[in-house]
Curated annotation (Swiss-Prot):
InterPro entries the UniProt entry points to: DadA, FAD-dep_OxRdtase, FAD/NAD-bd_sf
GO MF, one annotated term: D-amino-acid dehydrogenase activity
Similarity-based family: Belongs to the DadA oxidoreductase family.
Source organism of this protein record: Klebsiella pneumoniae subsp. pneumoniae (strain ATCC 700721 / MGH 78578)
EC number: 1.4.99.-
Gene: dadA
Protein's name according to its UniProt entry: D-amino acid dehydrogenase
Length: 432
């Protein structure tokens, strides 16, 4: 089968790899000159299934109001003048109760755990290297309340069979020795030993090269103007004067998927702006060993080989990619506060990207009402974490194989009135 994939970020390239391995003739189209040039370029580097959770959570609406008046707030909102933004925020607000949070987090963890397993299998099979580490994730708490609230997430982890350690402040240095210098600022942490890290752009670039060697065609520097349709099928992809045809089409354009699908499929995917710093390591014993997540500021600090990646924050401001100095100052403040000797912060590279976010935090993976149009987008801050699992899942669905995990509640149909999953959702399916 000829499959055309729109997008060469980590999700699009992973989809191309698994579809090619399933025997399909795959073409990837992207306006950029190479893979992973946008959202996948400089993310936080975490592969953290256990911390897969929606931004829509109990208490967030009240916190959002408080954050409006804080200098280092993790969330900021700026109206972009569109009704779509207002509708999206309203849908997100409706997901901020406990029932929706647990449901959304459950399916996110399911897909993320499965994806981590797929990544491990890919690594074992191909030997792909991407400055990856398997040292786990450590979520840091600065207040007693944060430490106490960890029990809510632990319940989901236990249901999913995800190993964890709840650590008091005095034990944090056992996991991250450099934290011994700042343990007095912390109340404890939640460690997930099975989580991983790695350079997403490096992984995507190398996987794309492997996919090309396996027969995948990459059409870079090729802008997509429109999807053409005839009846209930997509007839081709219009790129200037050229029409590229396939038997199946996969939309993996991230935040740009919504506009490209306008008039065909309504998907609630909105750009969530984030920032990162990439910092050369100064002192090995002052740098992180793996990755930490600061619960207060929602900022991740991740160790690559000789670099530290600091990433986080969320701005609901549309497609504005302006680099704001106050955001850089927040990232610098957090990394200096926790790892004061770790990196040459003054030499950092500052970056911003747009994460494709759904109101419920769960990506949109599956077929649309068009019989040959498939979606693999809306992964938000978890594109790197979920890429391999989403790629394998979309490959299985297009190939007519039964996926290893429940999947019907990942499709865009869940936003339709009266939608009910067709089968029970067992998180343990992520380990099948």
């Amino acid at each position: 089968m000829r499959v055309v994939i729109l997008g060469s970020g980590v999700v699009g390239v992973a989809s191309a790899w698994y579809l090619s391995q399933a025997g399909h003739d795959v073409t990837v189209i992207d306006r950029q000159p190479g893979p992973a040039e946008e959202t996948s370029a400089a993310n936080a580097g975490q592969i953290s299934p256990g911390y897969a959770a929606p931004w829509a959570a109990p208490g967030v609406p009240l916190k959002a109001i408080k954050w409006m008046f804080q200098r280092h707030a993790p969330l900021a909102i700026g109206l972009d003048g569109t009704s779509f933004q207002l509708k999206w925020m309203w849908q997100m607000l409706r997901n901020c109760d406990t029932r929706h949070y647990m449901e959304n987090k459950g399916r996110m963890v399911r897909l993320a755990e499965y994806s981590r397993d797929c990544l491990k299998a890919l690594r074992d099979t191909t030997g792909i290297q991407y400055e990856g580490r398997q040292g786990g994730t450590l979520q840091l708490f600065r207040t007693a309340k944060q430490y106490e609230n960890a029990t809510r997430d632990i319940a989901v982890l236990e249901d999913a069979g995800v190993p964890y350690q709840l650590l008091e402040a005095k034990r944090l240095a056992e996991v991250e020795p450099a934290l011994a210098e700042v343990s007095h600022k912390l109340t404890g942490g939640l460690r997930l030993p099975n989580d991983e890290t790695g350079d997403c752009q490096l992984f995507t670039t190398r996987l794309a090269a492997m996919a090309e060697q396996a027969g995948v065609t990459f059409r870079f520097n090729t802008a997509v103007d429109a999807l053409l349709h005839e009846g209930d099928r997509i007839a081709g992809v219009k790129c200037g004067d050229e029409i590229i045809k396939g038997d199946a089409y996969v939309m993996a354009f991230g935040s740009y998927s919504t506009a490209m699908l306008k008039g065909l499929v309504d998907i609630p995917v909105y750009p969530l702006k984030g920032y990162s710093l990439t910092i050369p390591i100064a002192q090995e014993d002052g740098a992180p060993v793996s990755t930490i997540l600061d619960e207060t500021y929602k900022i991740a600090i991740t160790r690559f080989d000789q670099r530290i990646r600091v990433g986080g924050m969320a701005e609901i401001v549309g497609f504005n990619k302006t680099l704001l100095q106050p955001r850089r100052e927040t990232l610098e403040m957090v990394v200096r506060d926790l790892f004061p000797r770790g990196g040459h912060v003054e030499q950092a590279t500052f970056w911003t990207g747009l994460r494709p976010m759904t109101p419920d935090g769960t990506p949109v993976v599956g077929r649309t009402a068009y019989k040959n149009l498939w979606l693999n987008t809306g992964h938000g801050t978890l594109g790197w974490t979920m890429a391999c699992g989403s790629g394998q899942l979309i490959s299985d669905l297009i190939s007519g194989r039964t996926p290893a995990i429940p999947y019907d509640d990942l499709a865009v149909a869940r936003y339709s009135p009266g939608f009910t999953p067709a089968r029970p959702q067992h998180l343990h399916g992520a380990h099948n």
